Amino acid sequence: MNAEVIIVGGGIIGCAAAYNLAKNGVSVLVLEGSENIGNGGSTRNGGGVRQSGRDPRELPLVMYSIQHIWPQLSDMLDTNVEYYQEGNLRLGSTPQHQKILEGLADRAAACGVDVRMISGDEARRINPYLSDAVTCASWCPTDGHANPLMATMGYYKMARRLGAHFISGEKVVELRKIKGAARQVVTESGNVYAVSYTHLTLPTILRV
């Protein structure tokens, strides 16, 4: 099977990429090494949709997604991804914790994130179940949470509806170059898939 873009990995990144490419009329093939789409960390995580505590290099994309993608994602995918924007507390109970949290908050705020340091009492007003041991916290009211399984499967189903092809149980073991460009993908079972042009997206290249 040939496609303009071959995506190695059927996690949320691969499924989201397939959705957006197919939406724009690009032929897409997704190869997933396991038997199930989203079988790894994409569907087995806490579901945090957060800006706080991130590497500043990630923040422009994360901030864009929180402003323009997550609030409407359920409608886009025709799937309830259970997205809630209820804020994020990062807690501390020692002076060392406070120093770390202040650094994280300052770096994020410098990038435009709505995040600030608050006292333990302020944190307990937000979440009354917190221990009295909490003495400080960073608070980002625009952070939230979503269901990672529903989000991944929502992208998968909509990508298929738009014409993307998915094959599970096909572990990629080799990329073949033709005239200096990656043009073929070889799987453990011996199947060879060809890229129609020169596009190749590898969200899980380190795992293959």
Where are these predicted regions, by residue range?
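Helix-loop-beta segment of a Rossmann-like dinucleotide-binding subdomain
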Residues: N80-R90, L104, M117, R124-L162
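Helical element adjacent to the flavin cofactor pocket in flavoenzyme catalytic cores
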Residues: T142-S189, Y193
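Conserved small/polar residues in nucleotide/adenosyl-binding loops
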Residues: T198-T204
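Conserved dinucleotide-binding and phosphotransfer motif residues
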Residues: N24, C111, L162
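N-terminal Rossmann-like FAD-binding beta1-loop-alpha1 element of flavoenzymes
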Residues: V5-L29
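Dinucleotide-binding Rossmann-like beta1-alpha1 core, especially the glycine-rich loop
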Residues: G46-I126
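A short, glycine/Asx- and small/polar-enriched loop/turn
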Residues: Q96, N127-V134, R176-R183
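Glycine-rich FAD pyrophosphate-binding loop
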Residues: K23-G41
